[in-house]
Amino acid sequence: MSGETFTITIDQRPVDVVAGETVLKAAARIGIKIPTLCYLEKCGPLNSCQVCLVKINGRLVPSCGTVSEPGMSVESESVEVHEARRTALELLFSDHVGDCLAPCNRLCPLRLNIPVMLRETEEGRIQQAISTVFETLPLPGVLGALCHHPCEQGCRRGQWDDPAAIRAIEKHLADEHRQSKTPYIPSRKPASGKSVVIVGAGPAGLSAAWSLLRQGHSVTVADRHSQAGGTLTSVPPRHLPEEVLAGETRQLASLGLQFRFGSELGRDLTLDGLLRGFDAVILAVGGVTPAEAQSYGLESSSAGIKAQAETFETSRKAVFACGRAVREMTQVLRAISDGQSAATCVNQFLMGSPIRKTPKPFSSIMGRVGRTELKLFLRSTSTSSSTTPCNPSAGLDRREASLESSRCLHCDCRSSGSCALQTYAQTYGVDASRFRSQRRNFEQQVQPGGVIFEPGKCILCGICVKLTEIAREPLGLAFIGRGFNVRVSAPFNRSIEDGLRQTAEECVKHCPTGALSWK
């Protein structure tokens, strides 16, 4: 009867429920978050995505539409349930057409959000663009000068004419920052009370220092030379001006980095002595021989110091190694990335956490697109060819950087970072290609009012259809077709915008996949 209460158990935890209450709601009341893609309380259970599966009495059922019953025993976090949810997600990706991350972003080992940087530069929001760069890149001036820019190799604009000049734009932002009277200082966590010494002031060592300083640790860099930079100091000034490297050193000093020059490992420094004064040691000493590695008291490999590939740990506790001290490395970007990755592992060690490689952010990958599909991207971007700077030696000025940035195709998902499908794919370790068949064509419907509909990202959850029904939209949205050809659209071959006269904002807000977004 209405109002009757009884007890069920969820993951062996008792919870009192009211008759008619779903398992999903009961779980939420005791802090158990069951993933959902097709559930919005206002719409009620739609039972379409199957991501909210739980196990009850030996059966897998959707928790959003399963009503609690007296004595019910629910499993929501078992291995079997997790595997079922992962399979449900992988089935949704079997017909998913779109990238979570743009190819340029995926190919950057430092994970710079390049599309955001380009949009900010295009719109003249230079301080925001500088913030985007300086919150992500350890040595942006050096990278603007010397990066081998794998991002540009993956830029889809290059399939049409020329890729966006990403490195040149990054260089422009670094130059703007260096010339600013109020330089941007990256955010930093409160002091941790932990200290690290890095032996080697080359690109890997300086990158590791930048990352650890931002985690709140005290960092000292020791180097046998009289200035920071390592191999960077031998780069001809026409490729890396001295003021660029000096600016990077000042930036690190503003974060609190201490330098100890004229100190060489094996001559002035020993690991025993360093470990007495610091909580962890990173060796970024450049190329070393196996004999030199052994003289430090460490196991060696054919390349130098023997270190675990994913954790950078050496044979001695609290001693880590990265860069050319561990493996042959000729590209500055790789050395900087290596230092940053090593710093992540050292931070885990200092915080007492398990030391493991940072997982890459999940991204569905659409792959190479055809010319017809490229034209869809080009509709909302500049069709100009690549920008040639008026002063090639100085690089792009602000106007030229904006023009070049406007050539970005915006092929990243507008909902990346806030997309529930992407979030759960990361959480459950989804293999997006497990059930992948031949990809259907990419579609993008740009509406005059600013709504963008990408049918290839729609999972037919039904939320937008239900919201337009609840709001009594004059036209609304509906499921059109049958079987595998079902799609969401406005009736009578009208546009999506016609169906969202009153509910566009609400439908975009609650779309779980980015199929509906704002331009």
Where are these regions (language model features)?
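Solvent-exposed beta-strand sheet faces enriched in polar/charged residues
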Residues: 260-262, 480, 519
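Ferredoxin-type iron-sulfur electron-transfer modules and their immediate structural context
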Residues: 2-195, 247, 280-321, 325-510, ...
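Short secondary-structure capping/turn micro-motifs that flank functional sites
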Residues: 43-44, 228-229, 267-269, 484
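Cys-dependent condensing catalytic cores that perform Claisen condensation/acyl-transfer
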Residues: 209, 274, 282
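Generic hydrophobic/aromatic pocket-lining and core-packing "Φ" positions
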Residues: 209-210, 271, 332
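Conserved dinucleotide-binding and phosphotransfer motif residues
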Residues: 30, 215, 255, 274-277, ...
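Beta1-alpha1 glycine-rich phosphate/pyrophosphate-binding loop at the start
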Residues: 112-115, 121, 159, 163-167, ...
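A structured beta-alpha segment of the ubiquitous adenosine-cofactor-binding alpha/beta core
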Residues: 88, 251-277, 393, 397
